[in-house]
A protein has these predicted regions:
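Non-catalytic helical/linker scaffolds that mediate oligomerization, partner binding
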Residues: 1-480
């Protein structure tokens, strides 16, 4: 089994049932629905297609809804002579960004961020379209921010605006994000990704909305702002996982800092047993090519060897020409990296060692010493499985739960295959639990009689999450 997981962005190239099925068959573990594009109706169709494809293929695939976040964008531009809503900026010219609602031209554009004049000062850099166009603020007057074009280039409607080094006064969740979050909860999403997280407290409003809606969903923090890197450890502790969003990170931070920042994100996420996704241009050239560059193949493999739980595609599968080929290529690279470079994955240091963490770590040691065929964890929230997974054991991990959303959440956990039950297991005696475990794994073809397995669970009758306190070394078939 491939150990590291694959997250794929769904878009026009793959949103049909056939398109999504091709990604699932190629190896997709988590489907990303990007709420920066499309309507709720569009994404509902994608969600339904995803569930249908997973059912038809018999694979566990999670639905991740990625909230747009407080992204600053240009407004609309007037159409040019070619009928395109695009302008060409030239070096040295003056260009104005205004909070007034106007149609833009080569001299001025509106912006979605009404607080821009209050946050900008003379000398501040402003980047458009991921830094392809660079401006420098010359003055601020009323609703207008006056700039000089430093790096020229084309600008079109709704291109992103970044203010590197500027602490912008934006909320963690916009009105659109709150509406999209409620939609995701009601639709049945398994994972939420929050964009432009800056502080650990950014998760608070999301939790308030979830409580109002009656269901908590794991929230992954996208690390892309300098403030997020400054507050990284507290963010990792507060959120359920993180995504290293290297695109905006490379615009907001000096480019040369991104590789080491990525490694630090992976290390901290593993330390606190939180799944970590490495994203942005992992196999970027495959948007237009059936093969990646050598550098991209190395980037993908090195993310896994650094200890990431998953790598992610963006444009490659959303609008690319070879989406299924991209996923199968990523799967091959990932599989080879873990099969032949397993001992290169760093050992963990300074573990966050709760009682559950200590039990999980002991289970990994036992499985290794006994050459066990499996580590089995019964779980309600997925926490125990993540604590086993962070140690990157060579032994296969099987998470067993009767919670459907936890079942899908475990699709993101390194080295883990999960089983969904339709019955409760908390009140089973030790013997009954072992017989029950044998049947699940034998029916799935994972073990045979005589194999040793290590089983993690809570005490009989214990229903509280986070109470894993028992390790059983069991020989399959011994309790029959």
């Amino acid at each position: 089994m491939r150990k590291a997981k694959i997250v794929d962005t769904i878009g026009p190239a793959t949103e049909s049932l056939e398109g999504i099925t091709s990604l699932v068959e190629a190896g997709m573990d988590v489907a990303r629905l990007n709420r920066s594009h499309g309507t709720p109706e569009d994404h509902l169709k994608v969600y339904n297609n995803l569930r249908a494809a997973a059912k038809a293929t018999g694979r566990n695939v999670a639905a991740l809804v990625d909230l747009q976040g407080p992204k600053i964008r240009c407004g609309w531009f007037k159409k040019n002579a070619d009928g395109e809503d695009k302008v060409q900026l030239t070096e040295g010219q003056e260009f104005v960004i205004t909070t007034d609602d106007i149609e833009g031209d080569e001299h001025i554009t509106s912006t979605t961020f009404k607080g821009l004049p209050g946050d900008c000062h003379a000398g501040d850099p402003i980047l458009i379209d991921d830094g392809k166009v660079r401006l420098e603020v010359t003055k601020v007057e009323g609703n207008n921010v006056y700039t000089k074009v430093v790096v020229a280039g084309p600008v079109s409607s709704h291109k992103g605006i970044n203010l590197p080094g500027v602490a912008v006064s934006l909320p963690a969740l916009t009105e659109k994000d709150e509406a999209d979050l409620r939609w995701a909860i009601r639709t049945g999403a398994d994972i939420i990704a929050m964009s432009f997280v800056r502080f650990a407290t950014d998760i608070d409003r999301a939790h308030e909305i979830m409580d109002e809606e009656g269901r908590r969903i794991p929230v992954v923090a996208k690390i892309e702002k300098p403030q997020a890197l400054e507050n990284l450890e507290e963010i990792v502790k507060a959120f359920d996982g993180i995504m290293v969003a290297r695109g905006d990170m490379a615009v907001e931070c000096p480019l040369e800092e991104v590789p080491l920042a990525t490694k630090r994100c992976i290390e901290l996420a593993r330390q606190y047993a939180k799944p970590v996704i490495v994203a942005t241009e992992v196999l970027g050239s495959m948007v237009n090519s059936p093969v990646p560059t050598r550098a991209e193949a190395s980037d993908c493999a090195n993310a896994i060897l650094d200890g990431a739980d998953a790598t992610m595609t963006s444009n490659e599968t959303a609008v690319g020409k070879y989406p299924a080929v991209t996923v199968s290529t990523m799967s091959r690279i990932s599989s080879f990296a873990t099969e032949h470079g397993f001992d290169r994955i760093p050992e963990l240091k300074n573990l966050d060692m709760s009682s559950t963490g200590a039990v999980s770590s002991a289970a990994v040691d036992l499985a290794d010493k006994l050459n066990a065929k499996a580590i089995v964890a019964y779980t309600q929230t997925g926490s125990t499985v993540h604590r086993v997974s962070r140690e990157r054991p060579a032994t296969p991990i099987y998470g067993i739960t009767n919670n459907e959303h936890t079942y899908h959440w475990l699709a993101l956990s390194w080295g883990t295959e999960s089983f969904l039950l339709d019955e409760d297991y908390h009140d089973k005696s030790r013997k009954d639990l072992m017989v029950f475990t044998d049947k699940i794994l034998k029916d799935a073809g994972k073990v045979t009689d005589g194999d040793k397995i290590v089983v993690l669970s809570s005490a009989q009758g214990e229903h509280q999450p986070g109470r894993t306190d028992s390790i059983y070394v069991h020989t399959v078939g011994a309790c029959d």
